[in-house]
């Protein structure tokens, strides 16, 4: 169904977009390192919560994109456009429902998740959460718009917007953090501004009728329960999977937060780099959902299998390259970030251990899941990922920390166990072909 040129046009912009999106969070973390460990700790802690919430929006966008892709694959363009409208309605409503309590109850929320942290870390965290929470509706709408353009095979546009957003974010950080000396609040303001502009741009461009998916009028959107239900059948299990995954990270983060600012700062840097190393591969996974979704909609099941295998192999190669580059330059990265000596030493040591294992097991533990979800096999993915994460990451980490008094290394031992077990389960599910037996539209 796809030529090599079509795949290149879809995947290369997606890879760049994901890398650029990751840079937005990374820039905040790196730039606040210059104002102390309390600042980097605050950004790291709150971003753990932010990622949890943003992944809920991403799950909704995924549900809508899969529905749209299968409708387009079966040549039902009108229904695909209607699904897009319902996606926009859904993410707007859900984002507002989440934003309001996160702002009003941010202190008890942070205390509940992270427990007792140093006062200056908590003060910075409260400011950072208040401002970044205001951006939730805008990142939700941007995700919905970006997903629709990817489904229309126009992944270059979201990449271009992401590039502009990152430039704006960097300039904003320079102005707010260093010129106005606003600290973590400056980093948050820059992120908020860039997300508002990104959402407005993509929603404006989404009104152009020349593309496969478009919205003729936002004011005319009314809820349609049947279409929303189809989106939620994909979005809710995916959201639970993503949400539980990030919630598990928060539980682990709360354990790390009691180890002091040196461990928190080192863990934050390694976690940021680990996430960054797989962003291009995640871009391939997002492209896989579009490709496999259209194949399944057209009932081309062998093509769906073929693209899942070939794109997983490509993502594996890309992940290895990124990991190798980061391992090679980790000392320079920590120096450039201005990390304190003890935090930098710990971060370098952890990175070399973690990335050697990540090269082997990360890709097969994640990429096949994109193909499964595109075919509608979301419950299996949700159950597998949730159980593996809680048993391996959370239980193993807490056990190692409290029994053997390990530091941040315990987190990565648990994560490595999760990657390994998940890899074998997903590969077995893929070979069984049961993932192709679901009906979505």
Which residue ranges define each predicted feature?
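Short runs within selected transmembrane alpha-helices of multi-pass transporters and secretion channels
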Residues: 61, 131-150, 158-166, 187-202, ...
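Interfacial/gating helices of multi-pass transporter permease domains
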Residues: 32-51, 119-124, 184-185, 227-234, ...
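Helix-terminus/linker motif at the lipid-water interface of multi-pass membrane proteins
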Residues: 23-41, 110-119, 175-184, 243-276, ...
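Short alpha-helical transmembrane segments in multi-pass integral membrane proteins
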Residues: 1-14, 68-135, 179-236, 292-358, ...
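Small-residue-rich hydrophobic transmembrane alpha-helices
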Residues: 40-100, 139-158, 264-330, 361-385
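N-terminal transmembrane alpha-helices
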Residues: 2-30, 34-35, 51-63, 67, ...
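Hydrophobic transmembrane alpha-helices of multi-pass small-molecule transporters
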Residues: 52-55, 169-173, 199-203, 276-279, ...
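Transmembrane helical elements of multi-pass membrane transporters/channels
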Residues: 9-28, 131, 165, 194-198, ...
């Amino acid at each position: 169904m796809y030529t090599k040129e079509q795949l290149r046009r879809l995947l290369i912009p997606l890879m760049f977009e994901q890398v650029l999106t990751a840079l937005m969070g990374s820039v905040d973390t790196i730039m606040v390192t210059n104002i102390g460990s309390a600042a980097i700790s605050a950004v790291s802690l709150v971003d753990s919560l932010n990622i949890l919430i943003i992944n809920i929006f991403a799950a909704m966008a995924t549900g809508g994109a899969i529905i749209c892709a299968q409708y387009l694959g079966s040549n039902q363009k009108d229904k695909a456009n209607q699904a897009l409208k319902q996606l926009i309605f859904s993410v707007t409503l859900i984002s507002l429902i989440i934003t309001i309590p996160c702002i009003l109850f941010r202190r008890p929320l942070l205390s509940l998740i992270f427990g007792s942290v140093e006062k200056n870390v908590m003060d910075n965290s409260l400011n950072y959460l208040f401002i970044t929470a205001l951006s939730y509706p805008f990142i939700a709408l941007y995700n919905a718009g970006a997903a629709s353009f990817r489904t229309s095979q126009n992944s270059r546009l979201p990449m271009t917007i992401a590039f502009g957003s990152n430039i704006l974010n960097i300039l904003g950080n320079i102005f707010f953090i260093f010129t106005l000396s606003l600290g973590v609040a400056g980093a948050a303001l820059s992120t908020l501004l860039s997300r508002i502009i990104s959402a407005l741009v993509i929603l404006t461009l989404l009104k152009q009728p020349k593309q496969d998916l478009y919205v003729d009028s936002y004011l005319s959107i009314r809820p349609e329960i049947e279409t929303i239900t189809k989106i939620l059948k994909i979005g809710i299990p995916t959201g639970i999977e993503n949400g539980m995954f990030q919630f598990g990270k928060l539980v682990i983060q709360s354990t790390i937060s009691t180890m002091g600012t040196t461990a928190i700062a080192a863990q934050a840097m390694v976690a940021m780099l680990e996430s960054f190393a797989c962003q291009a591969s995640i871009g391939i996974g997002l492209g896989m959902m579009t490709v496999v979704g259209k194949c399944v909609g057209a009932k081309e099941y062998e093509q769906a299998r073929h693209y899942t295998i070939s794109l997983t192999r490509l993502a594996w190669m890309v992940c290895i390259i990124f990991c190798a580059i980061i391992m090679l330059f980790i000392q320079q990265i920590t120096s450039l970030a201005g990390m304190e000596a003890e935090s930098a030493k710990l971060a370098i040591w952890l990175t070399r251990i973690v990335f050697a294992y990540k090269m082997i097991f990360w890709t097969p533990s994640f990429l096949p899941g994109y193909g499964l979800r595109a075919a509608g096999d979301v419950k299996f993915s949700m159950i597998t990922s949730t159980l593996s994460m809680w048993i391996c990451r959370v239980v193993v980490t807490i056990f190692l920390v409290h029994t053997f008094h390990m530091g941040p290394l315990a987190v990565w031992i648990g994560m490595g166990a999760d990657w390994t077990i998940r890899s074998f389960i997903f590969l077995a599910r893929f070979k069984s072909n049961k993932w192709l037996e679901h009906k979505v539209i």
